[in-house]
């Protein structure tokens, strides 16, 4: 791409991920990594597929976005309305986009944007997904892996880069010799997954979390961060109660500090009044 395609193969970014596509030219196919981005904001729960909106996305791609939306609502919208909207886009994409092989990448970018947890740009990912979060096989896996490997090689291999693929596609691997050597030497990695949860844990380097009896996810987990942000949007939707609560807490803290300071002052004054009497009594005793 001679540096014209904006791709990052190191560092961490919010709502940004390396997706993989296949370009067919005559009888040849080659893989092309693409930057996929997600932006979120307070809204009514709509997910805008920009490719579809400008008639660059096909029906299979649109189906993938709907499946992703269904997964989000099933996981996080059982007890509350999702008060956010989002937009998804393949950056620097000027042709038709179809197929559902970017569904896992799109959902990962969206969860990163909501949770405010960055994605490791050392990884590229491909895979379709069903409503249950199970990852499904895709086509062109070899070309996709080789395409991202070439991009990493141009920017410099770090030993941390690699591609995340559906486990079912492992049987289809027939990679170039240089890619196989890089994998053998630990310079490049291929990781197989079965679920979206496994993908998120690799991309964000923390557990997704488990749901407890109270309907909350494990602290400091990916899904807990998602729920925290959704609760924040819910509080804003409910009105001024969210804004008043922190002020009340601050006032209580100030009142406690003031009472403590006054108590300390009274104690000091009492000590000051008692000290001369004690000295005087001691002198009389002598």
Put a short name on every predicted segment.
Residues 11-24, 30:
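N-terminal amphipathic/basic leader segments beginning at the initiator methionine
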């Amino acid at each position: 791409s001679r540096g014209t395609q904006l791709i990052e193969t190191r560092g961490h970014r919010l709502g940004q991920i390396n997706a993989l596509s296949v370009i067919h030219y005559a009888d040849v196919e080659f893989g092309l990594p693409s930057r996929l981005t997600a932006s979120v904001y307070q809204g009514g729960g709509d997910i805008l597929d920009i490719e579809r909106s400008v008639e660059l996305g096909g029906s299979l791609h649109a189906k993938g976005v709907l499946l992703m939306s269904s997964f989000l609502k099933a996981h996080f919208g059982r007890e509350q309305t999702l008060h956010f909207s989002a937009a998804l886009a393949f950056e620097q994409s000027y042709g038709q986009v179809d197929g559902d092989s970017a569904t896992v990448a799109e959902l990962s970018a969206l969860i990163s944007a909501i949770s405010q947890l960055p994605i490791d740009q050392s990884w590229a990912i491909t895979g379709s997904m069903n409503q249950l979060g199970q990852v499904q096989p895709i086509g062109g896996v070899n070309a996709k892996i080789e395409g991202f490997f070439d991009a990493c090689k141009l920017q410099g291999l770090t030993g941390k880069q690699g591609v995340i693929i559906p486990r079912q596609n492992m049987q289809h691997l027939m990679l170039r010799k240089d890619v196989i050597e890089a994998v053998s030497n630990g310079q490049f990695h291929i990781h197989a997954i079965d679920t979206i949860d496994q993908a998120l844990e690799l991309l964000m380097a923390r557990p997704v979390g488990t749901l407890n009896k109270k309907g909350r996810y494990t602290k400091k987990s990916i899904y807990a961060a998602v729920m925290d942000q959704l609760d924040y949007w819910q509080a804003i939707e409910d009105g001024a109660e969210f804004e008043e609560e922190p002020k009340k807490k601050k006032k209580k803290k100030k009142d406690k500090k003031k009472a403590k300071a006054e108590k300390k002052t009274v104690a000091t004054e009492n000590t000051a009044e008692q000290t001369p009497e004690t000295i005087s009594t001691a002198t009389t005793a002598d």
